[in-house]
Design a protein with these regions (language model features):
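Hydrophobic alpha-helical transmembrane bundles of multi-pass membrane proteins
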Residues: 1-402
Length: 402
């Protein structure tokens, strides 16, 4: 019997390791989606820079999270013999890999907001600080119970802050960090003339659409695999993700009046919003959550660019920041059993946790980017921006003229 139990335990550990490894690879692939979404949106003279930022940011994120960030979040260090950290078929290692892909999404989100005028090396420095310290602080508070906030919310309001796959922990955090960076950078040259918005058309709708589709497919790994074990897998998460994606698509199509940029960001808005409550909501609630997010993105992107003069190139603040906030709140609404959900959530806890995420992101964003701006500078020179980051930073364009 002991041998049988040992064999069963080994099978469980190996299956869970494979499961979360597949999830990590799927979310890793989403970074290609971030890259092509940005490549398709920016002007051609900044496409190489977009690709280079996403890959470089991921590399820096890995180092920052491996050596510092993961320890801050979960108190786990890998500075031990390989025989120790490879226990249970290396489940702890692939869990780190999976959560790393979440952490690395933060600078990938920011990259889209600061595109076309941010300096390359200072952004890598910002990535290191954000992934090593700011993101892990809030991640640990929510997903590891650090500092006792979750226990206090549970005792005071009957439920802790619920964010199953990161509407607030990942997306709102990235979006509000990006807002701080965008405000400190200022708009691109020529974006506003005499107070009026000047249109900068996307360089490639096909690349933009490709990026959107890669993100959509990978998102099912992002959400479903957030269970982190086979025993915790729920088909409800998959279907809710699907319904929110569809709701966001249809809403953006209607409100955006057939604009392909809005259309291909609509499903992403829905998926951002459903992350928090995808394991709790009824599919109809998920559809409503996604639809509201899709419309919210279109309205707020238009207002931010035209009325508020916030030159957020990919609209990452409305897409991730505002839709992430909506996702945290929506979980407290549509996750209630009275709304067809599984229950076990408190709207007050959701509001407190979401607000804390926004505050941490804004304070951290202004601290990091403000310090770098003061000490080293954030922005390309006027001449560098005019010629584009491809030639100014990387000395090569996206397309050869030969």
């Amino acid at each position: 019997m002991e041998n049988l139990q040992s064999a069963v335990d080994s099978l469980v550990h190996s299956s869970n390791t494979l499961f979360i490894l597949i999830g990590a690879v799927m979310v890793l692939a989403m970074h290609a989606g971030f890259a092509f979404l940005e490549v398709g949106t920016v002007r051609q003279k900044n496409q190489v820079n977009a690709l280079s930022k996403i890959l470089s940011d991921f590399a820096i994120s890995t180092l920052a999270y491996f050596f510092i960030g993961y320890w801050i979040s979960y108190g786990v260090t890998f500075m031990q013999p390989a025989a120790v950290i490879n226990a249970d078929h290396g489940y702890g290692l692939v869990k780190f890999f999976f959560l790393l892909t979440f952490a690395a999404a933060i600078p990938a989100i920011i990259s889209g907001g600061i595109a076309e005028r941010a300096r390359f090396v200072p952004q890598l420095c910002a990535t290191a600080f954000i992934v090593a310290f700011i993101y892990p602080f809030f991640e640990g508070v929510v997903w590891n119970g650090n500092f006792g906030l979750q226990a206090w919310l549970l005792e005071r309001f009957g439920a802790s802050f619920h964010d199953f796959a990161g509407s607030v922990v990942v997306h709102a955090m990235g979006g509000w960090l990006a807002l701080a960076a965008v405000l400190l950078l200022g708009p691109r040259q020529g974006r506003y003339r005499e107070g009026k918005l000047v249109a900068f058309a996307p360089s490639s709708i096909p690349f933009l659409a490709l990026g959107s589709w890669i993100l959509i497919v990978g998102w099912f790994g992002f959400n479903v695999m957030s269970a982190q074990t086979l025993q915790g897998v729920s088909g409800l998460v998959a279907i809710n993700s699907l319904m929110a994606m569809v709701g966001g698509t249809v809403a953006a199509l209607i409100v955006g009046r057939n604009d392909p940029g809005f259309l291909h960001n609509g499903p992403l808005a829905g998926l951002v919003a459903i992350c928090a409550g995808s394991d709790l909501m009824h599919p109809v609630g998920a559809l409503a959550t996604g639809a509201i997010a899709g419309a919210l993105f279109v309205w707020c992107f238009t207002a931010a660019q035209g009325k508020w003069h916030i030159d957020d190139v990919l609209g990452v603040w409305p897409l991730h920041g505002l839709c992430g906030v909506w996702g945290g709140i929506a979980c407290g609404i549509f996750g209630q059993s009275a709304m067809g959900g599984l229950g076990g959530v408190s709207l007050i806890s959701q509001l407190i946790g979401t607000a804390l995420g926004v505050v941490v992101a804004l304070v951290g964003g202004f601290a990091v980017y403000g310090s770098i701006k003061a000490l080293h500078g954030l922005r390309l020179s006027q001449e560098e921006e005019y010629y584009g980051a491809d030639l100014s930073v990387h000395k090569i364009g996206a397309v050869s003229q030969d």
